[in-house]
Amino acid sequence: MSIVVTTPTGHVGSRVVRLLLQAGVRPRVLVRDPARLDEAARAQVDVRRGDLTDAGFVRDAVAGARSVFWVDPTPHSAADPIETSLRTAAPLVEAAQVGDVKRVVLLSSIGAEKRHGVGHIDALAAIEERLDATGVDVLHLRCAYFFTNLLLDLEGLSRGVLTTAFDPDHPMPWVDPRDIGDVVAARLLSDAWQGRLVQAVHGPEDLTFNQVARILTEALGRQVRLNLVSDDGVRDALRAAGLPPSAVEGIVGMTAGSRDLVPEQPRALLTTTPTRLGGWAHAHLRPLLEG
């Protein structure tokens, strides 16, 4: 069973690699810096060193794979994030078109079902469509808002402030990336699916940002209050940080385009994962703020 894993050092990919190894599978990992791989796993995986933005590297590295787990590596701060995401995925799509790849599991996002108007998520929607057109077996995992996004504002949380441009009273699904890794590994190891499938990964429950602030207050042992900002406020901050216009709109659009979103896949047994935000925050966020 030949399985390729991209971004194997990330929150999701590292979990996938560990689970595949525990299942007796030696995955082929595409990684820019092998030193960042988990030391215990490094000697047990097939390492292909290169950059996912190098089309030739990707084309060669995925050739002959039974399955590929694809994670778009494009940073939201890229000069043209949507174009970069599509260009980066192009060699995978080409490999699927000519039969060099049999199955793809794509890390997508809720919001991709809208196809347009959701900022950088529009790129994932387009990648979904391009993979669908190849005719290979493809699974689009439309994932919820990552718990780990909270790690991007440790400075604010250290002051007891959670900043957001989302509607504070609108419930949305939140998920632990490790739970996504569990779903990915199970799908990669299974031969029981084929064709085009979409599966949401919604975490254990939908939460409003007001609820998140209360959960963090308890888990972190400190008062956490919401700081609501407007889309224009986010734009101003991103411009001040030097981000180019396409990146600014790609980031703002992900929030603005998701405010009224009702995910295409309803919450159900198949979409619900176990890890709750409070436990995750106590175990992973609190030590960082107390250190």
Predicted features by range, described:
Residues 50:
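Cofactor-binding loops of NAD(P)H-dependent oxidoreductases
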Residues 231-291:
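A hydrophobic C-terminal alpha-helical subdomain
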Residues 59-62, 213, 252, 281:
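A generic alpha-helix structural signal
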